[in-house]
């Protein structure tokens, strides 16, 4: 029985996608830093944009985000991100206990525009955008082309409630025809920047 299990394990590992092995580790050009050393997080969401990723080596998705906050909650450093339920990334956020927020140099704005306007349901948008997945020691996706990566564990999630919104927020959802976003609060576990 042990030989059979070992043989099956070897067979299964040989059949895994090649990218799972080649992208399994973060490059050595990433350096761990403190969340307190992140420069001007408002610029990350507001001006530079960022990618939100969730999943693992077998299946992942990412999208561009422009809404988010850094802060403290329950004595822990946190990042809050917002995802419309219609987004494919939301399926990954619901299934996984971690997410990553990845910042990029300004020359990657075209890639961020692409992953923000195309769905991963219909093809490998990350490859088309020229983004190369790498994975943290916890198995969470980041991108080789990024220059900042924040790994978070989801500690709270909840959909916005229309009855609690002001008129401007309600008008946003009426105009865009989106369902109210889901807020994901993640405790910051690790932060890296490029050397």
Regions found by a protein language model. Name each.
Residues 7-15:
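Bacterial N-terminal signal peptides
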Residues 1-4:
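Positively charged n-region of N-terminal signal peptides that target proteins for export
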Residues 16-20:
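Sec/Tat signal peptide C-region and signal peptidase I cleavage site
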Residues 21-195:
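Basic, polyanion-binding surface patches
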């Amino acid at each position: 029985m042990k030989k059979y299990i070992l043989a099956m394990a070897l067979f299964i590992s040989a059949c895994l996608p090649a990218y799972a092995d080649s992208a399994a580790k973060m490059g050595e050009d990433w350096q761990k830093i403190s969340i307190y050393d992140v420069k001007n997080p408002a610029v990350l969401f507001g001006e530079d944009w960022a990618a939100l990723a969730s999943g693992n080596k077998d299946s992942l998705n990412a999208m561009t985000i422009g809404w988010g906050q850094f802060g403290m909650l329950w004595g822990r450093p946190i990042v809050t991100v917002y995802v419309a339920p219609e987004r494919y990334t939301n399926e990954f956020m619901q299934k996984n206990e971690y997410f990553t927020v990845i910042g990029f140099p300004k020359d990657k704005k075209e890639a961020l525009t692409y992953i923000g306007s195309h769905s991963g349901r219909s093809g490998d948008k990350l490859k088309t955008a020229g983004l190369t997945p790498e994975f943290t020691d916890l198995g969470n996706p980041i991108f080789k082309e990024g220059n900042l990566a924040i790994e978070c564990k989801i500690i709270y999630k909840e959909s916005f409630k229309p009855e609690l919104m002001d008129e401007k927020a309600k008008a946003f959802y009426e105009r865009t025809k989106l369902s109210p976003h889901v807020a994901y609060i993640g405790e910051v576990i690790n932060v890296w920047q490029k050397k």
